[in-house]
């Protein structure tokens, strides 16, 4: 446990000492809220509004709809990119020093994943400084549900990041592959647009995307979907169905947990063998 804590602590200290990284964690989400939220709010309402749902569209606030997606984006990108430190440590020789020590390789992998998980949750929580400016009401009940959900999602995504980092040898290669993965996963998760009326092949990609369930879980918690008008809930894409079954927050948490167990196992095995 001591070695896991030491690796976790190292990543946390590096995060807080990197001022540029802290600034960047605010800048990109802020730009997304301004450009997508404010600039496209009217267009999205017009596209989603139909003759049968005028009242629902009148109360559709795209900025509020998008905010949980921004949280998902921040947690996703931070979790995945946290594994970049593994590749950099390998390139600079630091990882070799750890590997020749009596520390178990599984402990190294778990320590790195927990470090990435914690940083991702911290950055996700920092986004709540924008809440007063977008008119969202966040209460204690929401946060009690949201924080464990964020830890669960960040753990799963950090495990995916470590799996990728264990398979790639250079920082440039890692960043290239991650960039290729990030945008399809984000845009097919419903983070920025309701995922309704998609073609069958795209629905399949949405269904197998772990980020879909993560973002939907965040939206249902933050927007308190169970209290929304049914028409508005439908318009916002919060009635996610898989194989004809409407998914609940519990279903989504269970799916993300199973993915997390699978990916941390694969990542630990791959990390142990590749180094």
Question: Positions of the model-derived regions?
Answer:
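Hydrophobic alpha-helical transmembrane segments of multi-pass membrane transport proteins
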Residues: 31-36, 58-134, 186
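Residue-level recognition of transmembrane alpha-helices
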Residues: 7, 25-26, 66, 70, ...
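Alpha-helical transmembrane segments of multi-pass membrane transporters/translocases
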Residues: 220-275
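Alpha-helical transmembrane segments and their short interhelical loops
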Residues: 105, 109-179, 183-185, 244, ...
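A short amphipathic helical element positioned immediately N-terminal to and/or at the very start
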Residues: 1-16
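Hydrophobic alpha-helical transmembrane segments of multi-pass membrane transport/permease proteins
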Residues: 17-46, 63-78, 122-124, 179-187, ...
